[in-house]
Amino acid sequence: MTNLKPSLIVLSLFFSVELFAQLTVRNNAYIFVDDQVLFVEDDVNIQENTANIYLRNEAQLLQGTGTTGNSGIGRLSVYQRGTVNNFNYNYWCSPVGNTSGNNNANRPFTPNNNIYDVTAAPITSSLAAYTSGYNGSSSPLVISSAWLYSYNPGGQYSDWDYIGAGGTVAAGYGFTMKGTTGSGSNQLYDFRGKPNTGEITVQVLAPVAGVPQSTLTGNPYPSALDARDFFHMDPENQAALAGTGAGALYFWEQNSSSHVLASYIGGYATYTIDSGGIVAYIPAPWATYDAAGNVTGGVGTSPNSTPGVDVPGRYLPVGQGFMVEGAANANIYFRNTYREYWKESSGDSHFFRSQDQNASEDQNVNEDTSNLLPSNYMRFRIVYDIEHNSQYFSRELLVNMADYATDDYDYGMEAKLSETFPSDAYFVCENVPFGILAVPFYLDRKIPLVVKVHHQQNVKFRTYALQNFPDDLPVYLHDIDNNTYTNLRIQNAEVNLAAGTYTNRFEITFQSETLGVEEINDTDLMVYQNNTTSELTIKNPNSYQINKVSLYDITGKQIFDEVKLPINTEYTFSTKKLSEGTYIVKVSLENQTVSKKVIIHN
C-alpha cells in the first residue's frame, strides 16, 4: 500500500504516469496530477477531510478491477467546463459523491457539497453559492437552484424530480443545471468529493402503453468512458437497451433566450455506436445547415449566424450526462473496465456543446467519425428543410450501409428518434420512426422516407457528407406520386406539399427507373451470369439500342462501364478476374435502366 503521510506531497509532473496497487492520502497531504493519468488497481483512500487529490489540465483517475471500493472523507477534485449560458441546460453526471460517510460505497452527489468555485490558484476553491432566483452568475460562482433536476424511473413511469441545492442524486444518475451570466457559455466547475469507482447500477424502464420511459444518466467516473464498451461489452446492457431503436444516447441541445417554457427552443441529438467503434450521430432538428453541412442558424433566426457544435465521439468525457430509453424493466451497468484515459483536447471526446454559442473552430457534424469508416462501409445524410411561421429548421437523417447490416433493427448501427414533430421526416424500422438507419447496400435498394407537414408549403431535401460513395453513384429522391427522380448529389429537391403525413410518397434510391412508352420485360432483355464460361451474358433478341452496361460490386464500387455498344442480339463480358460474390448489373437503354443481381463463382 502506498501511504502518503502529512509531510509528503507527490507532484505528478515529475512522472509520465502514476501507478499504484492501492493509494492512501493522509491528513494535510495531497497528490497533484497535471495532464497525466493516475492509475490505481484497487481502492483509493483519501482518509481525512484535509487530504486531497487534484486532477488538473485534463488529468484523469483510472481504477482497475479491485472490489474494495474507495473510502475516506477527503476529496478528489476534477474540473469540467459547462457549455451553455444562463438560459440553457447542460445535462451532467457527477464523477464524485458527497463525503458525509466513511465507507467503501459510492456516495450520492449533493450540489452544495460537491460543486466548487474555481479560483486562480490550482488547488484553492470554495463551495459554490446558490440562489433561488432564475439566473446564476459566474464570479463568484452562484448557481440557480431552480434548475437542478434529475429524471429518474419511478414505480412505473419516469419523471422529473427537483433536487435543488441540498438534494441528492445517486451515483450514475444525471442532473440538469443551467449555466451562468457573465461566463458566456464556458463556466468552469470544480467537482470535489469521493471519487466514484467500480460497478454502478442505473435503473431503466420498459415503454408504458407504447410510450418510451427515459432515465437521465451519464459518465459517472473521473475519467473518460468508452461508449463502445458500454454498449457492447455487457450483455445486460444490451438486453436493457436493445429493444427496437432503444440502443441510443440522447443529448439535450438548446438555444433559448428565455426561462419561459413555452419559449424553449431545443431537442435531443441522437447517438449510437457499433461494436467496431463507429459513431453514428444526428443533431436535434432545430438548427439549420448549409449545403456543406455547417450549422448556419436555429429556429427563430434567419440562417446567417455560425454557431458551432462539439459532436460526441467514442469516449464520453468527465461529467457528461445523457438520456437513455429502456427496452425492458432492467438495470444498466457502468464498470471500471469501460474507463479510458482520453483527453478532450485529443479529439473523439467532447463534452456535448449546444449550438447556441459561437465556436472558435469550424466543427462539421461528422468530423470525428468520417475517418473511422472501413472501405466497405458507406454513409450519407439526408436533410429535410422546412419553414414554420418564418422559423427555419432542418431534420438531419443518417443512413449507414454495410454488408453486415440487415433489414431489421441493428443494435449500435441505427437508432429511433426520441420524438417527432408536426413537421418532420424520418425512416421507419419495425414500425418505429428512426433517425439513423442501417441497411446493406444494393444498387436497387429503395429506402422509404416518411414526411410530415404541418401546413401547406414548399419543403426541401438535400444530401451531404457522403462517405465511401463512388463518384458516379447517384442519390435520388424519388417522388412516387409525380414519378420524378432528383439526384441530390447534383441539386436539391423542392416540392410543395399540403398539410399531412406522407408515408408512401417519397423514397431514396440509387438508380432512376423512369420508364419510356415501351416497358421492357425479362423476355425482351435477359441478363445472367454464365459461371461455366466465366462470362456475364446479356441477350437482346429485339435489338434494342443499349447505351451502357455497368457492373458494381456489393459496396457500390464500379467494376467496369462499357459505353457506345453496337446493336447486337447478345453481349458477353469476361468475369474471370473478378472475386466471387454478388454483383449488380446496370443496363442503360434510351428510356429505361434495367438492373439485375448476379452471383459470380469462378
PLM features: residue spans?
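Bacterial Sec-dependent N-terminal signal peptides
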Residues: 1-27, 514-518, 557, 572, ...
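Extracellular beta-helix/beta-solenoid repeat scaffolds
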Residues: 22-85, 189-198
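Glycine-rich, histidine-containing beta strand-loop boundary motifs that form or position
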Residues: 48, 57-59, 87, 93-96, ...
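Extracellular, surface-exposed repeat architectures
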Residues: 59-113, 202-206, 211-223
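Surface-exposed beta-strand/loop patches in extracellular or lumenal glycoproteins
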Residues: 89-122, 229-236, 456-469
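Extracytoplasmic redox metalloprotein regions
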Residues: 95-206
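Compositionally biased Ser/Thr/Gly- and acidic/asparagine-rich
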Residues: 156, 162-165, 169-170, 177, ...
